[in-house]
């Protein structure tokens, strides 16, 4: 059975294996054991209440409960940009016009922005390609909404998610090649590694401070502004079905889109509800896949089950209860997947 749980120190070796499969561009999951260990430790201290809000971040893993294999990772940053500036570009417009010459040009322009400072961030979503089946991607991505719904006071009113931009299998980023490399004088992979290992001072020191006309970029770079890596397209679709939208903010490195949504308007958060759980044999029928989560902050668990999403009393097997760290009579959080999201 596939289960979402909080990250543990012993997960570092399996997370290293996951990091080696990302293909680059996933800044928050570098193939660097020391950095991953620090990230795990920060998550543990967040759960223990030892960190200020500006440093808090939760990390979860998707585990096969039968084998202990870690198949995926996802995370939430509580409030971005309160320690180090959180940069992106806002894609806006500058108008150059002359009535005398009868000239009017509206030019797409990139403006350096810190507009999302303080927002909660969905990040570090990666599922091992071998496990991209049977609804695992939905479970991994949406489990975070179940945690946010249960512990709403831990998070801010706006949630953002940076989507990985267009990068090829060799680490070539058209957006970086045309813009970032001119200011940072390094390859994309180097900048990505430095950022992923926490060495972010160079961003503020070297990045352009003035608006940039996108027409000055290569056509290839212009074409990928706000576009996602092919492997990230499903993750974008999942978030958009939950209510997230692209509001013309992009990543400063690869030009990938930043999606955003008010936390209380996220579908899974808004529609999830608490029901009593009982042990037994679930009724047979053509029921939709639903997320089920416990309400245990320190031992949070989420699984995917097929059940009636309108039920007031959820029947689970002993194995499902054990996976959720629940007992009969406990209350669990329940919400169905979107109707078009299939798990088989």
UniProtKB/Swiss-Prot annotation:
Pathway: Amino-acid degradation; L-arginine degradation via AST pathway; L-glutamate and succinate from L-arginine: step 1/5. Keywords: Acyltransferase, Arginine metabolism, Transferase. Succinyl-CoA binds at residue 125. Pfam families: AstA. One of its GO terms (biological process) is arginine catabolic process to succinate. It catalyses: succinyl-CoA + L-arginine = N(2)-succinyl-L-arginine + CoA + H(+). The active site is at residue 229. The keyword Acyltransferase applies. One of its GO terms (molecular function) is arginine N-succinyltransferase activity. Its EC number is 2.3.1.109. Gene3D superfamilies: 2.40.40.20. InterPro entries: Acyl_CoA_acyltransferase, Arg_succinylTrfase_AstA/AruG, Arginine_N-succinylTrfase. Belongs to the arginine N-succinyltransferase family. Catalyzes the transfer of succinyl-CoA to arginine to produce N(2)-succinylarginine. NCBIfam families: arg_catab_AOST (TIGR03243), arg_catab_AstA (TIGR03244), PRK10456.1 (NF007770). This is Arginine N-succinyltransferase. It comes from Escherichia coli O6:K15:H31 (strain 536 / UPEC). The lineage of its organism: Bacteria, Pseudomonadati, Pseudomonadota, Gammaproteobacteria, Enterobacterales. The gene is astA.
């Amino acid at each position: 059975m596939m289960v979402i749980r909080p990250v543990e120190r012993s997960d570092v070796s399996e997370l290293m294996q996951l990091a080696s499969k990302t293909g680059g561009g996933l800044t928050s999951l570098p193939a660097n054991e020391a950095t991953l260990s620090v990230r795990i430790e920060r998550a543990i201290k967040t759960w223990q209440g030892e960190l200020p809000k500006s440093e808090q971040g939760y990390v979860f893993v998707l585990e096969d409960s039968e084998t202990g294999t870690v198949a995926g990772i996802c995370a939430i940053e509580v409030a971005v940009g309160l320690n180090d500036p959180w940069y992106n570009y806002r894609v806006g417009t500058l108008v150059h016009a002359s009535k005398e010459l009868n000239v009017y040009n509206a030019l797409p322009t990139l403006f350096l922005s810190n507009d999302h400072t303080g927002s909660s961030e969905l990040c570090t979503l990666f599922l091992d390609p071998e496990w991209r089946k049977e609804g695992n991607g939905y479970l991994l991505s949406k489990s975070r909404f179940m945690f946010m719904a249960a512990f709403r006071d831990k998070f801010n009113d706006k949630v953002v998610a940076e989507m990985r931009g267009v990068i090829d299998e060799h680490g070539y980023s058209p957006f970086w090649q045309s813009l970032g490399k001119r200011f940072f004088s390094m390859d994309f992979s180097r900048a990505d590694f430095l950022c992923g290992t926490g060495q972010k001072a160079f961003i503020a020191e070297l990045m352009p401070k003035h608006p940039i006309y996108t027409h000055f970029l290569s056509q290839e770079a212009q074409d990928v502004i706000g576009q996602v890596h092919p492997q990230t397209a499903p993750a974008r679709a999942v978030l958009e079905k939950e209510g997230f939208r692209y509001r013309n903010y992009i990543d400063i490195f690869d030009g990938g889109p930043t999606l955003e949504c008010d936390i209380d308007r996220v579908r899974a958060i808004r529609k999830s509800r608490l029901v009593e759980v009982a042990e037994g044999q679930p009724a047979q029928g053509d029921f939709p896949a639903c997320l089920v989560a416990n309400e245990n902050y320190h031992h949070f668990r989420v699984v995917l089950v097929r059940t009636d999403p309108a039920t007031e009393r959820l029947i689970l097997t002993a194995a499902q209860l054990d996976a959720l760290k629940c007992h009969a009579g406990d209350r669990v959080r329940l919400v169905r997947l979107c109707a078009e999201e299939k798990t088989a």
